[in-house]
């Protein structure tokens, strides 16, 4: 967690110096995965290490004080995220992140990144340039002002709305947020927007180490993923997916795809006990010719 918060603050400084939204993308991805994944649900402590596969567990105690550096440094990540959430300078205002919030001149309503939209309501009057960070992963973002769709929205940029604002003007942002596969070596992982997805032993849906069959490509969208109701309050997001899992091709039953469940990485393993196992990278089937 100490490294996570330091990385977030480093990206914050780079964002302020360069104005490049890719650093806001990095803060966002870190915040919703490694950072929130390290935080215990009751807010009492931050985990020292957040592995991509394994368990969540307590950090070491320093100097017999029943706390550690990660729990001490952890709150700085919230300060970084909130400090860069909304910025106003001169004749422009910038939204770097999306969540329900009340800021100077605007209200935002959103369950992002659980949902793929944000709604911004104006409480200001007069000319102002409103800048919206468009994440690099959102290939086809739609922005509307008072119901009218605006021009081309380029991924990985700031979209500027130069407007003479009136009380009650509404901006709607719709992100392109499919589940995407990422391959590395003979392994595959899945993301949805800025969020890494994981399988969790609490779903009780089979062997988490079972390999995926060949054929999944890097950057491939995965249309069989669907958002479902979370099984308990321990999960923030949940998805079902019908996927080619298992290597028993010669068996007609084994050749069928399997339906399994995923959650967001921050929720994975958050029971904080040894029996709660999760996994984000999955083995991909391969042979001696590869």
Annotate the PLM regions.
Residues 1-15, 71-81:
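Well-ordered alpha-helical segments within folded domains of soluble proteins
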Residues 138-163, 181-185:
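Solvent-exposed beta-strand/loop surfaces of large extracellular or lumenal domains
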